[in-house]
Amino acid sequence: MKTPLTEAVSIADSQGRFLSSTQIQVLFGRFRQAKAGLXAAKAL
């Protein structure tokens, strides 16, 4: 299963580069949203 993280890493790798700081910030934002979603689901 591909996740946004593995997708971004594989694209950067295929282009022979590292992730940009913007891409890393977007990924951390997605992790924060996922964490908040899990916390909300647990509260139900």
From Swiss-Prot:
Signal peptide: none
One Gene Ontology cellular component: phycobilisome
Keyword Thylakoid belongs to the record: yes
Subcellular location: Cellular thylakoid membrane
Domain of life of the native organism: Bacteria
One of the GO BP terms on file: photosynthesis
Modification comment: Contains one covalently linked bilin chromophore.
Membrane topology, as annotated: Peripheral membrane protein
Gene3D superfamilies in the cross-refs: Phycocyanins
Entry-linked InterPro entries: Globin-like_sf (IPR009050), Phycobilisome_asu/bsu (IPR012128), Phycobilisome_asu/bsu_sf (IPR038719)
Record keywords: Antenna complex, Bile pigment, Chromophore, Electron transport, Membrane, Photosynthesis, Phycobilisome, Thylakoid, Transport
Main subcellular location of this protein, as a coarse class: membrane
Misc. comment: In cell culture induces a urokinase-type plasminogen activator; may therefore be useful in dissolving blood clots.
Similarity comment: Belongs to the phycobiliprotein family.
Function noted in UniProt: Light-harvesting photosynthetic bile pigment-protein from the phycobiliprotein complex (phycobilisome, PBS). Phycocyanin is the major phycobiliprotein in the PBS rod.
Quaternary structure note: Heterodimer of an alpha and a beta subunit. The heterodimer further assembles into trimers and the trimers into hexamers.
Name of protein: C-phycocyanin alpha subunit
Naturally occurring in which organism (per UniProt): Limnospira fusiformis
Phylogenetic classification of the source organism: Bacteria, Bacillati, Cyanobacteriota, Cyanophyceae, Oscillatoriophycideae
